[in-house]
């Protein structure tokens, strides 16, 4: 006789009009997350999730597509205003924020939260092409 499996219960996230936008832009990928005011994730997307591979993942167009996918879900759930938190040195940071604004979600402020070392780890060596 087969064991009964319990399906994982989907989390209920309370969505109000205000929220947070987190854009994590590394040298290899871009991750866009929209959260409510408590910080619980409403929707997320990344360039890799949208089907981009390799060096195409860190392009402004890939960031635009990821932000569009993320914003559509959150807008339908009722999110209207966000504070944008941008982290990382990669391309497409501004592109993602512009796309969110274009989708009907108002960006009230943009905060750069890129971690800066106080001379921590040695950076990777320069590429010789």
UniProtKB/Swiss-Prot annotation:
One of its GO terms (cellular component) is ribosome. GO terms for biological process: translation. It comes from the Bacteria. GO terms for molecular function: rRNA binding; structural constituent of ribosome. Keywords: Ribonucleoprotein, Ribosomal protein, RNA-binding, rRNA-binding. SUPFAM superfamilies: Translational machinery components. The keyword Transmembrane does not apply. NCBIfam families: PRK05309.1 (NF003698), uS11_bact (TIGR03632). Part of the 30S ribosomal subunit. Interacts with proteins S7 and S18. Binds to IF-3. Belongs to the universal ribosomal protein uS11 family. PANTHER family: 40S RIBOSOMAL PROTEIN S14/30S RIBOSOMAL PROTEIN S11 (PTHR11759). Located on the platform of the 30S subunit, it bridges several disparate RNA helices of the 16S rRNA. Forms part of the Shine-Dalgarno cleft in the 70S ribosome. This is Small ribosomal subunit protein uS11. It comes from Bacteroides fragilis (strain ATCC 25285 / DSM 2151 / CCUG 4856 / JCM 11019 / LMG 10263 / NCTC 9343 / Onslow / VPI 2553 / EN-2). The gene is rpsK.
């Amino acid at each position: 006789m087969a064991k009964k499996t319990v399906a994982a219960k989907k989390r209920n996230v309370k969505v109000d009009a205000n929220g947070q936008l987190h854009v994590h832009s590394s040298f290899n990928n871009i991750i866009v997350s929209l959260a409510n005011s408590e910080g619980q994730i409403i929707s997320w997307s990344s360039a890799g999730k949208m089907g981009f591979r390799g060096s195409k993942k860190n392009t402004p167009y890939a960031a635009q597509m990821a932000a569009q996918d993320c914003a559509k879900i959150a807008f339908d759930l009722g999110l209207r205003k966000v504070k944008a938190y941008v982290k990382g040195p990669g391309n497409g940071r501004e592109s993602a924020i512009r796309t969110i604004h274009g989708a009907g979600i108002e960006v009230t402020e943009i905060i750069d939260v890129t971690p800066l070392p106080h001379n921590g780890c040695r950076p990777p060596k320069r590429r010789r092409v």
